[in-house]
């Protein structure tokens, strides 16, 4: 379930909200031959044709699984169903004509990560994707850059809805000397962990008192440990793992670094900025939307680790510059507060109900 990890609830959910494990509606397709056809298509894209479209519609999601979802949605008599991410957006698009509810596809990553990267969910299936997305009553995306991509490529009119910043109870950083922080899922390709190691090595050459907190867990955890050992960085890097209080680490940081190859939004960026921590990140849709370059952080051309490290070093060596950018970061983070995002969320729901 999306609200659990290793059997533990990640978020506090109001008791009035009923949770349904969607695995109960899914069908095991592990041994179906079509599974291998779709896996091959993610590398070659041969199904993206007029002839391939019927096959995709009939086989990508099992008929029994679609039937289970249709029966469940209609039985519950929902007014609106929001599909979070590309998979559930496509599902809702397929079954739209068979359910009574209004449907919204809420995209939580970038257009290119969903559709243009080999191996991505929608890679090589763009005719199918366009048909599914155009059937929905609304598409929400995270940034204005994504809106341009989704709209121009899919022929839709999406709406931008930011992820709201979680509550920060007045936590402010003390700008501990030479201390930087990274927070995110430990996934080498996505989060650019190889670039992170490079950047830390280069910063250490200029800042001998450097210390680093790396917050998060993921499939590349062991790989990262080995890389840090090989680079002789183990003594200055603290692998925090998962924590329920990230603010205790932001409260010491002088700079946050974000090395992702792609980033749909960047909640950790906002969390750090709300504590007064300036952020250095590679240009990406999310960081570009949040960070005002040279005002509350720095945006670096992909994937220039020399320039990245140099900007971090500048901030670590210029206390007044760092503090001024930190003040601007706090100010910017308020643009993403729940008080600002929630009214837009409500308005978009109302517009979906009215067919706007």
Q: Language-model segments: what does each one mean?
A:
Residues 1-56, 149-151:
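N-terminal strand-loop element at the rim of the active site
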Residues 57-70, 80-100:
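An aromatic- and histidine-rich active-site surface loop
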Residues 67-74, 111, 120-139:
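Membrane-proximal helix-turn-helix segments that form the acceptor-binding/catalytic region
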Residues 102, 130-169:
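Donor nucleotide-sugar binding/catalytic pocket of nucleotide-sugar-dependent glycosyltransferases
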Residues 172-191, 197-200:
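Conserved donor-binding/catalytic core segment of Leloir-type glycosyltransferases
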Residues 242, 261:
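Aromatic "clamp/platform" in nucleotide-sugar-dependent glycosyltransferases that forms part
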Residues 278-281:
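Short hydrophobic beta-strand element within catalytic cores of glycosyltransferases
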Residues 293-294, 298-305, 314-319:
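Conserved acidic donor-binding segment of nucleotide-sugar-dependent glycosyltransferases
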